């Protein structure tokens, strides 16, 4: 029987822990020989969506393009892990509808915690007015209303977050 693909979409503020969880989850899935690709928001912006800015329209287009790639890979039995802020609910729902096999993971941490974790100094620069339209500061983040999984990275350990996602994937029939 052919492996069923799925897009696992991690959304949340910058610094919430999306990339950290994605890396740990990818390692666990690779250990079990699942076909896997990771699409990290920063890497995608450098390669696939270079030239797009941070207006709502450009952010939506960025997510649409990521979703297009996810759809191609997912229907060929690949587990696609997306780590992207993807701040707007409507475009996340649009992408979910196109892909079908889609598990939304809300990586949730309070803004203050995200700012404490900010190794790149982006929040500091946004608060100083050096970065405009920064999600969580002067641009909104719309949390998912009904994510399949919510990871509270300010309250739980990394392993707990990863295991919650694996449990949900198993419940939904994606794991063999």
Curated annotation (Swiss-Prot):
Pfam families: APS_kinase. The active site is at 86 (phosphoserine intermediate). Gene3D superfamilies: P-loop containing nucleotide triphosphate hydrolases. One of its GO terms (molecular function) is adenylylsulfate kinase activity. Pathway: Sulfur metabolism; hydrogen sulfide biosynthesis; sulfite from sulfate: step 2/3. Its EC number is 2.7.1.25. Keywords: ATP-binding, Kinase, Nucleotide-binding, Phosphoprotein, Transferase. It catalyses: adenosine 5'-phosphosulfate + ATP = 3'-phosphoadenylyl sulfate + ADP + H(+). ATP binds at residues 12-19. InterPro entries: APS_kinase, P-loop_NTPase, Sulf_AdTrans/APS_kinase. The keyword tRNA processing does not apply. Belongs to the APS kinase family. HAMAP family: Adenylyl_sulf_kinase. This is Adenylyl-sulfate kinase. It comes from Gloeothece citriformis (strain PCC 7424).
């Amino acid at each position: 029987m052919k492996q069923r693909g799925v897009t696992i979409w991690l959304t949340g503020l910058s610094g919430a822990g999306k990339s950290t969880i994605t890396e740990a989850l990818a390692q666990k899935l690779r250990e079990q020989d699942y076909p896997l690709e990771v699409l990290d928001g920063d890497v995608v912006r450098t390669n696939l969506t270079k030239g797009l800015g941070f207006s709502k329209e450009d952010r939506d287009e960025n997510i649409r393009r990521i979703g297009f790639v996810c759809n191609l890979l997912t229907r060929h039995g690949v587990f696609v892990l997306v780590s992207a802020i993807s701040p707007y609910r409507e475009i996340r729902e649009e992408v979910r509808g196109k892909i079908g096999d889609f598990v939304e993971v809300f990586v949730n941490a309070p803004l203050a915690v995200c700012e404490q974790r900010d190794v790149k100094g982006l929040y500091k620069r946004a608060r100083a007015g050096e970065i405009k339209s920064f999600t969580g500061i002067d641009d909104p983040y719309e949390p998912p209303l009904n994510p399949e999984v919510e990871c509270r990275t300010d309250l739980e350990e990394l392993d707990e977050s990863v295991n919650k996602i694996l449990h949900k994937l198993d419940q939904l029939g994606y794991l063999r």
